[in-house]
C-alpha cells in the first residue's frame, strides 16, 4: 500500500479526516516539524531549495525572452521606441468573437496580442540587445543556466555532496563569499557587460559573439588603467544631443559622473551606471575581505559583538549590549530570514521609488503605464516581504530564543521594555489617525457645504526645505544647492552638472523631486498612519509572541493557535500568527494609499493638469470622485451592449477581482461550526442521492480549522484586492496614453 500524503509526517498521514490534506499542505515547508528532521538535514534541504529558486527565476527570464522574440515586435519597437507599443505575447482564445479579435489585433500585429507593461523591452534594449536572434540566444542561455541550477540542487542532496553543518555555520566565510564573489564580482562583471556591449550598442557600434574580442571599448585601451591615469576614461562623454543607438553626438567615455538624464531617452547615462557598478563592485570586494576565516586576518564577528557593550557604571545601566548575539543569530534560521526579508523589503520599496524618479532604462520614462505598473508591483512586493520579516522574527522568539544565552543583552531588553515600545506605537498611530482623518473630514464637510475656502490646508514646509536643500528652486528657499551663489551649488555645478537640470525638470517631464503642497501633506500623513499601524501590529505580535500578562505561557502553544479552549477567556486572536494576519490587512490598506497617491499625482502630471490633483486631493470626495470614479469610467466601458474594445479583458478582470475579494469575507465572517454543520448536511444528502452515492471518499470531510479558514479568507482578500487594482491601474493609464 502506497504511503499516504504527507510522507513527512506519519502522525498526519494516519489522520482519518480531510484535515490530513490541509494540514499536510500547510506544513509542507515547515521542515523543522517534519519526521526525523535533524539540524544538518534542515540546512541541506534549504540549501538545495535555493538552487531550485534560481532555476525558477532563470526559466521566467527565459520564457519572457522566448515569447518576446517569437510573438513580440522587438525589432520594430527598437526602431521607434516612443511610438510602437511593445507586444508581450499572442492571445489565442476560443471565446473571442470577431469584435474581440479586431480589438486585440493591435500594435501592428496580424492577430490578437497583449501589450507589454513589464519594461522588459526597455531593459533588453538598454543592455545592448537589438535583434530577435539575440533574444533567442539569451533565452537558450538562461534555459541552460536553469538546468545547471536544478542539477546543482539535486547534486547537493546526494550523500557525497551534502555540505556539513559546520560549513553552514561558518558565518564569516559565507559573508565574505556573498560580499566579494556574489555581490562584488557580479557588479564588476555587469560593469564589463555595460562597457563592452551596452555602451558601444548605444553609440551605434554592434558588439556580438562574432566581434567582441576585437572591438575596443575605449580607444586608449587598458593603458590608462595600468598607468593610473583613470581620468582618461571619463573624458569626451556623450553630448546632450546624442541620439541613442547611433553614433550621432556620441563620445568615447566609458566611466562618467555626469548626473541627471540623457535628454532623448530620459534615463540615467549608461556611462554613469557603469561607473556606479564598478565602484559598488570594488567596495564589495574589499568588504568581502573583512571577516576572519582560517587565514587569520580580518575581524571576528563574535569579537565585534562581544565588544559592543556599554562601559560599566553607565548611568541608566544599558545592560550587556550585544553579548550572546553571535550564536543567537547564527543558530536561528528564522532570525536570519527575518533580517534578510526586512533588508529585501526596504530595498524593493527603494527600487519602486528609484525606477520612476531615476529611470535607468532607455525611454521607459515615457511609457507611463509601464511606470505605473512597475511602481505598484514593487511596493506590493515590499509590504509582503516586510510582513514576512516580522512573522519570522516572531517564530524566532517562539522556537529559537534562549533567555539564558541572551541574559540582559539588547534582545532581552527589547522584550523587557516592550510595553513602552508598543504603547508609543499605539500613541503615534492614534495621533496620526485622528488628526489626519480630522483634517480630511473637516475639508470634506466644508467643500460639501459650499465653502471650500474654509479648508485647512497645510503647506509641507519642512519637506519643501529638504527638496530645496537638494536643489529644488521653485519654493524660493535660499539654502544649500538652491542657493545659487553658495559653495555647495558651485561645487555641484562643477562636479555633477546634470543634477540641477534633473531636480528641476529642465528637460522633459522627468522631474526628480515633484513639487508638493497641502494634498501631498495630507496623504503623506495618511500613509504614515498606515505604516505605523502596520508596524504596531507586527511589532506587538513579535514582542508578545513568547507571552504576555494575559497569557504568560503563550510560547508553549506555538506560532499559530486559535485559542486555549473555552475555559480560558480572552485567549483567541492573540497568537503571533494572528498578528501577522491582521497586519497584512493594514499593509494592503497602506499600499493602497501609497499607490493611489503615486498614480493620481502622476496622471495629473502626464496629462498636464496638476491642478486636478492639487485641488481635489485635500478632501475625501475628491479622492473618490476625481481619482477612483473618474478613472474607472473608461475601464468599465471595456465592453457593453455595443461591443468591446482592447480594455475589455481588464474590465472583466476588474469585476473578477471584486468577486475574489468579496469571496474572502465568506471565510472571514462565518466560523468553523457553521461549515461543519453544512458539511454534515451535504454528506447526508450525498449518501442518499442515487448515482452520487456510488462515489465515496476515504477521508471523513471536516471543516477547515479556524486558522486555516482565516488564511484562505486572507488569501482571497489579498489576491482579489491585487487583481482589482491591477486591472484599474493598467486600464486607466493605458486607456489615456495608448
UniProtKB/Swiss-Prot annotation:
Binding, chlorophyll a B1:
658
A GO cellular component annotation in the UniProt record = photosystem I
Which biological process terms from the Gene Ontology are attached to this UniProt entry? photosynthesis
Chain segments annotated as transmembrane: 46-69, 135-158, 175-199, 273-291, 333-356, 372-398, 420-442, 521-539, 579-600, 647-669, 711-731
EC category: oxidoreductase
Which terms does the record give in the GO molecular function aspect?
4 iron, 4 sulfur cluster binding; chlorophyll binding; electron transfer activity; magnesium ion binding; oxidoreductase activity
Is Methyltransferase given among the entry's keywords? no
Entry's localization field = Cellular thylakoid membrane
* Catalyzed reaction equations: reduced [plastocyanin] + hnu + oxidized [2Fe-2S]-[ferredoxin] = oxidized [plastocyanin] + reduced [2Fe-2S]-[ferredoxin]
User: Its topology with respect to the membrane?
Assistant: Multi-pass membrane protein
Q: What does this protein do?
A: PsaA and PsaB bind P700, the primary electron donor of photosystem I (PSI), as well as the electron acceptors A0, A1 and FX. PSI is a plastocyanin/cytochrome c6-ferredoxin oxidoreductase, converting photonic excitation into a charge separation, which transfers an electron from the donor P700 chlorophyll pair to the spectroscopically characterized acceptors A0, A1, FX, FA and FB in turn. Oxidized P700 is reduced on the lumenal side of the thylakoid membrane by plastocyanin or cytochrome c6.
Q: How does it assemble?
A: The PsaA/B heterodimer binds the P700 chlorophyll special pair and subsequent electron acceptors. PSI consists of a core antenna complex that captures photons, and an electron transfer chain that converts photonic excitation into a charge separation. The cyanobacterial PSI reaction center is composed of one copy each of PsaA,B,C,D,E,F,I,J,K,L,M and X, and forms trimeric complexes.
**So what family is this one in?**
Belongs to the PsaA/PsaB family.
Protein name as catalogued? Photosystem I P700 chlorophyll a apoprotein A2
> What organism does the UniProt record list as the source?
Synechococcus sp. (strain WH7803)
Lineage per the UniProt record: Bacteria, Bacillati, Cyanobacteriota, Cyanophyceae, Synechococcales
Amino acid at each position: 500500500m502506497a504511503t499516504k500524503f504527507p510522507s513527512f509526517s506519519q502522525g498526519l498521514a494516519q489522520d482519518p479526516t480531510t484535515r490530513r490534506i490541509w494540514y499536510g499542505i500547510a506544513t509542507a515547508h515547515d521542515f523543522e516539524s517534519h519526521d526525523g528532521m535533524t539540524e544538518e538535514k534542515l540546512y541541506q534541504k534549504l540549501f538545495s531549495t535555493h538552487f531550485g529558486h534560481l532555476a525558477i527565476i532563470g526559466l521566467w527570464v527565459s520564457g519572457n525572452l522566448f515569447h518576446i522574440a517569437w510573438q513580440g515586435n522587438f525589432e520594430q519597437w527598437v526602431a521607434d521606441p516612443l511610438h510602437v507599443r511593445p507586444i508581450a505575447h499572442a492571445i489565442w482564445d476560443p471565446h473571442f468573437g470577431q469584435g474581440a479579435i479586431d480589438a486585440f489585433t493591435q500594435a501592428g500585429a496580424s492577430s490578437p496580442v497583449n501589450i507589454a507593461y513589464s519594461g522588459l523591452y526597455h531593459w533588453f534594449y538598454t543592455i545592448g540587445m537589438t535583434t530577435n536572434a539575440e533574444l533567442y540566444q539569451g533565452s537558450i542561455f538562461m534555459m541552460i543556466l536553469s538546468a545547471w541550477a536544478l542539477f546543482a540542487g539535486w547534486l547537493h542532496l546526494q550523500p557525497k555532496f551534502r555540505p556539513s553543518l559546520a560549513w553552514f555555520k561558518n558565518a564569516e566565510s559565507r559573508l565574505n563569499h556573498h560580499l566579494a564573489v556574489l555581490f562584488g564580482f557580479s557588479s564588476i562583471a555587469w560593469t564589463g557587460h555595460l562597457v563592452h556591449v551596452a555602451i558601444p550598442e548605444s553609440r551605434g557600434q554592434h558588439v556580438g559573439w562574432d566581434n567582441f574580442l576585437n572591438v575596443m571599448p575605449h580607444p586608449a585601451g587598458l593603458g590608462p588603467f595600468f598607468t593610473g591615469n583613470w581620468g582618461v576614461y571619463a573624458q569626451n562623454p556623450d553630448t546632450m544631443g546624442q541620439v541613442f543607438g547611433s553614433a550621432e553626438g556620441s563620445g568615447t567615455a566609458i566611466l562618467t559622473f555626469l548626473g541627471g538624464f540623457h535628454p532623448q531617452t530620459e534615463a540615467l547615462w549608461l556611462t554613469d551606471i557603469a561607473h556606479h557598478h564598478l565602484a559598488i563592485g570594488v567596495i564589495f570586494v574589499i568588504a568581502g575581505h573583512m571577516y576572519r576565516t582560517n587565514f587569520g586576518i580580518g575581524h571576528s564577528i563574535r569579537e565585534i559583538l562581544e565588544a559592543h557593550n556599554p562601559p560599566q557604571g553607565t548611568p541608566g545601566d544599558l545592560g550587556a549590549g550585544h553579548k550572546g548575539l553571535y550564536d543567537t543569530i547564527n543558530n536561528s534560521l528564522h532570525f536570519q530570514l527575518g533580517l534578510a526579508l526586512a533588508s529585501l523589503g526596504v530595498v524593493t520599496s527603494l527600487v519602486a521609488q528609484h525606477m520612476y524618479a531615476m529611470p535607468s532604462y532607455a525611454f521607459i520614462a515615457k511609457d507611463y503605464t509601464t511606470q505605473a505598473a512597475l511602481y505598484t508591483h514593487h511596493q506590493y512586493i515590499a509590504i509582503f516581504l516586510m510582513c514576512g520579516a516580522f512573522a519570522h522574527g516572531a517564530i524566532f522568539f517562539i522556537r529559537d530564543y534562549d533567555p539564558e544565552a541572551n541574559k540582559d543583552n539588547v534582545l532581552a531588553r527589547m522584550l523587557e521594555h516592550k510595553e513602552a515600545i508598543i504603547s508609543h506605537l499605539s500613541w503615534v498611530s492614534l495621533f496620526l489617525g485622528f488628526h489626519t482623518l480630522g483634517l480630511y473630514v473637516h475639508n470634506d464637510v466644508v467643500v460639501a457645504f459650499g465653502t471650500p475656502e474654509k479648508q485647512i490646508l497645510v503647506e509641507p514646509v519642512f519637506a519643501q526645505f529638504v527638496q530645496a536643500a537638494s536643489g529644488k528652486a521653485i519654493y524660493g528657499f535660499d539654502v544649500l544647492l538652491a542657493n545659487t551663489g553658495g559653495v555647495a551649488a558651485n561645487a555641484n555645478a562643477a562636479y555633477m552638472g546634470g543634477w540641477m537640470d534633473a531636480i528641476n525638470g529642465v528637460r522633459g517631464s522627468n522631474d526628480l523631486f515633484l513639487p508638493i503642497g497641502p494634498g501631498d501633506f495630507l496623504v503623506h500623513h495618511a500613509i504614515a498612519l498606515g505604516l505605523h499601524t502596520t508596524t504596531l501590529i507586527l511589532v506587538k505580535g513579535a514582542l508578545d509572541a513568547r507571552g504576555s500578562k494575559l497569557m504568560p505561557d503563550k510560547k508553549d502553544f506555538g506560532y499559530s493557535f486559535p485559542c486555549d479552549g473555552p475555559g480560558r477567556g480572552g485567549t483567541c486572536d492573540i497568537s503571533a500568527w494572528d498578528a501577522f494576519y491582521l497586519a497584512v490587512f493594514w499593509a494592503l490598506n497602506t499600499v493602497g494609499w501609497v499607490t493611489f497617491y503615486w498614480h493620481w499625482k502622476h496622471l495629473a502630471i502626464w496629462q498636464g493638469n496638476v491642478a486636478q490633483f492639487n485641488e481635489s486631493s485635500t478632501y475625501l470626495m475628491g479622492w473618490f470622485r476625481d481619482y477612483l470614479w473618474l478613472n474607472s469610467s473608461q475601464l468599465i466601458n471595456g465592453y457593453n451592449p455595443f461591443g468591446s474594445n482592447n480594455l475589455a479583458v481588464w474590465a472583466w478582470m476588474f469585476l473578477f477581482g471584486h468577486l475574489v475579494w468579496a469571496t474572502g469575507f465568506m471565510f472571514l465572517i462565518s466560523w468553523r461550526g457553521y461549515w461543519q454543520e453544512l458539511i454534515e448536511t451535504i454528506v447526508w444528502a450525498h449518501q442518499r442521492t442515487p448515482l452520487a452515492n456510488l462515489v465515496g471518499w476515504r477521508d471523513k470531510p471536516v471543516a477547515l480549522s479556524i486558522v486555516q479558514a482565516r488564511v484562505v479568507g486572507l488569501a482571497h482578500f489579498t489576491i482579489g484586492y491585487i487583481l482589482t487594482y491591477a486591472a484599474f491601474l493598467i486600464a486607466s493609464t493605458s486607456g489615456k496614453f495608448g
